[in-house]
């Protein structure tokens, strides 16, 4: 999966002219309980910054919007600050902290550990994240 993401990103870079955007001026912001998602579109790619406050948990804050058993968005993300505890549907779990890069397939829950907001920059799975399911 990582090779696929890298190939896709390389293709986008090779086929486009230079473009610079800032997550500080997002194209779209989605707010949900104890968090928000800021999206920028660059070329054909979508990059999202997720900000999750203490007490945020996917299964209580986003699940009501997604209406799925667990998070079905795959993620390839850089952890900027805070700690996220991630539990995959198969029972695998891990704390991700500032400086970590995580690749998460579909089927997981996550929550903020401690009193510091967790911030991630995601290069793959945020295009449909926290959208109201129909």
Question: In which residue ranges do the predicted regions lie?
Answer:
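Short, conserved beta-strand element in jelly-roll/cupin
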Residues: 68-86
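Conserved short histidine dyad/triad with adjacent acidic residue
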Residues: 49-70
């Amino acid at each position: 999966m990582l090779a696929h993401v890298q190939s896709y990103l390389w293709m986008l870079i090779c086929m486009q002219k230079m473009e610079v955007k800032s997550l500080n001026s997002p194209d779209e912001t989605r707010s949900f309980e104890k968090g928000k998602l800021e999206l920028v579109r660059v070329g054909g790619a979508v990059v999202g910054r997720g900000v999750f406050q203490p007490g945020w948990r996917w299964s209580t804050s986003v699940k009501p919007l997604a209406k799925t058993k667990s998070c079905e968005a795959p993620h390839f993300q850089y952890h900027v600050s805070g700690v996220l505890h991630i539990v995959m549907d198969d029972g695998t779990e891990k704390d991700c902290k500032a400086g970590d890069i995580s690749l998460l397939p579909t089927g997981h829950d996550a929550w903020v550990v401690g009193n510091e907001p967790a911030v991630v920059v995601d290069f793959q799975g945020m295009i449909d994240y926290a959208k109201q399911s129909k």
